[in-house]
Amino acid sequence: MKQLLITISVFMLIGCISFDKAITTHQAVFDGNIAAIKEYLASGAEVDAKDEKFVGTFLHWASAGGQKEIVKLLIEKGADVNATDGDGDTALHLAGSTTASVEIAELLISKGANVNAMNMSPPGRRIGGMTPLDMATLGNRHEIAALLRKHGGKTAKELGVNYLTTDSILRKDGKTGEELKAEGN
């Protein structure tokens, strides 16, 4: 009886701790817990609900986590395949830059994901101005890059977008970072 009371007390204490339900549910999606997302959506939650830390939707988390079945479920429930996170990334950007499968990228594209969406990060965040193809190329995701090309995907440079590169950040007086380094600067 004493152990039962202790166990009940522990569960009551845990229940009093305030967890950010959105973050824990988004993490469950990333980890592939399809039961958690089904339960959350059944409770009336918005399919495109964003977490507060990364400002990503369930579709972002499922895509980044390589969770194909959850991606399918979310799309069936009306998830916006072109929703952006706090960095301006779509789920397709994340599919190209993480361990997501080619099948996830194909599914997103087949449901209308913009293959040339630009991520434009807010000031103070990482460098923006990349397409899903740029992300796939940087992530050495050759199969996804080929898929994006097949569907008309282009790099930001090919689209004529003046985006920041590491070299452009390092330029000083028209010189590249390598030129400045060679001069001792």
Predicted feature locations:
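Start-of-repeat signature of ankyrin repeats
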Residues: 21, 54-55, 88, 122, ...
